[in-house]
Amino acid sequence: VTGGDPSDEELLAEQIRYYEARAPVYEQLYFLRGTHATDDEAFIRSWRRETSTLERFVEHLDTNGDVLELACGNGLWTRLLAPGSGRLTAIDSSMRMLERNREWIADPRVRYVRADLFTLELDGRFDLVFAGFFLSHIPPGHWRPFWVKVARWLAPGGTIAFVDDVWGPDRPRSGDRVSGGPEHAHVRRLEGSSFTIVKRFFRPDTLVEAFGQAGFDADVSTTGAHFLFGTARRVRRASAMSRG
């Protein structure tokens, strides 16, 4: 993104390029490997304790029906969703991410789709829609229309489940705010290149409010200092019988 304040469309296009470039090393941050390795034992303990909480949450989701994974990446969450799923559709905009996911997971129940989630239309109905570290990459102006669209993909009684970063006083730890640009524009650096992408940090209450504005009731918890997780369901409309 060059010249002036980046538009959301420019940010999203560069975000796709960033994750295409990051695909070979994406999981290093989660597992504290490579350039993300640290000797801080206290940090390592807290990080691993909290990632274990996320994994237990995902492992206990009801995946027996049709499952849709948004921005599936290289398989970090697909590996936990696929074993118990009836059928899993994994979508990402990055071909390199999908290739690494397919190689890592190697499960015939997983159907891979390369698509831009913000322009994608689906005919299917899913019992569970899962988003791992994707909510924080949705621009504010895209939030409500995106989740209204996802609501059409949910089967009756269907659930959205998610894990993501949580807001904290030290956020963002990785990447820099774009000076004078929109609050959700952040610069990420990778192997000598810079990418300006969308990155937002929610607190549980602000995420509940954001989902509410899109027509969902959300239940959000934190793991402690690093992450949040939870579920969201469509708000039940008052029936005609309740009108007085």
How should these model regions be labeled?
Residues 2-62:
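Conserved class I S-adenosyl-L-methionine
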Residues 66-119:
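Class I SAM-dependent methyltransferase SAM/SAH-binding core
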Residues 130:
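A conserved beta-strand element that flanks and buttresses the S-adenosyl-L-methionine
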Residues 133-137:
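Short catalytic micro-motifs in class I SAM-dependent methyltransferases
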Residues 144-156:
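A short glycine-rich, Lys/Arg-flanked "PGG" loop and its adjoining helix->strand segment in the class I
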Residues 163-213:
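C-terminal alpha-helical "lid/dimerization" subdomain adjacent to the S-adenosyl-L-methionine
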Residues 216-244:
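Core SAM-dependent methyltransferase catalytic element
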